[in-house]
């Protein structure tokens, strides 16, 4: 149970409301155009976590009435064949967005694969062109998890402008794009990573702490400022079957002013942000007569 003084940032509830809005929009579009958005999902191999995440995305598509095309490929598929499939999706007028589930097998160059996706269908927001637009504050597809985090903070009227933000994790998927979004919103941002000597130096002085590195209980209550906003992006599957984040939730929530639970925090916002990007891609393609 959460501490009485802390506010839980309920991503599941917000995502549910956004899904209802998306469903209504798609129904209206379908009635008017006899077309609907379609997300292509590529899964390579049989990684259990990847299969789980893909299934969650497919179920979300079904809930809002969005079509999908799932391609499950053998782990030993050649890079050339994967790139050829992406090229086919790029030119397929029935496909609104293309998503390649990460991570990919070691013999495949992930950067090359992500760069092969048409930027106008890059609903994961990982293409260098879209990342570049993010950095220069031009309209682009935002990576789903950072997009979901910002949407969640906005929903709870959490001020970012002028605040000190500590981001733990510098990945291309979460940490780097989230730092740019925070910077664009007027925050002073510190990004910590594996070579950071003393993470607590940054977290103890931060108004907002965001962490997503995949290490249970990395962030302790003693590392937080009283009343801090704590965004836990980590997802860790423990041997006892529990799913936890990167924050010691039970103790951290006694110090924090706002905190995301795991699960039901950032995860649902990531998926619904992907759906939003796919709808945006569809609408842009329709305006261009694609």
UniProtKB/Swiss-Prot annotation:
User: What is one GO cellular-component annotation here?
Assistant: cytosol
> NADP among the record's keywords?
yes
- EC number(s) for this protein? 1.5.1.5, 3.5.4.9
Q: Which UniProt keywords apply?
A: Amino-acid biosynthesis, Histidine biosynthesis, Hydrolase, Methionine biosynthesis, Multifunctional enzyme, NADP, One-carbon metabolism, Oxidoreductase, Purine biosynthesis
Record-annotated residues binding NADP(+)?
A: 169-171, 194, 235
Pathway participation? One-carbon metabolism; tetrahydrofolate interconversion
Has UniProt tagged this entry with the keyword Manganese? no
Q: Which residues cross the membrane?
A: none
**Could you tell me which InterPro entries the record lists for this protein?**
Aminoacid_DH-like_N_sf, NAD(P)-bd_dom_sf, THF_DH/CycHdrlase, THF_DH/CycHdrlase_cat_dom, THF_DH/CycHdrlase_CS, THF_DH/CycHdrlase_NAD-bd_dom
Q: Which residues form the signal peptide?
A: none
Per the record, the similarity remark reads:
Belongs to the tetrahydrofolate dehydrogenase/cyclohydrolase family.
- What biological function has been recorded for the protein in this entry? Catalyzes the oxidation of 5,10-methylenetetrahydrofolate to 5,10-methenyltetrahydrofolate and then the hydrolysis of 5,10-methenyltetrahydrofolate to 10-formyltetrahydrofolate.
- Quaternary form? Homodimer.
User: What name is this protein filed under?
Assistant: Bifunctional protein FolD
Taxonomic classification: Bacteria, Pseudomonadati, Campylobacterota, Epsilonproteobacteria, Campylobacterales
Gene responsible for this protein: folD
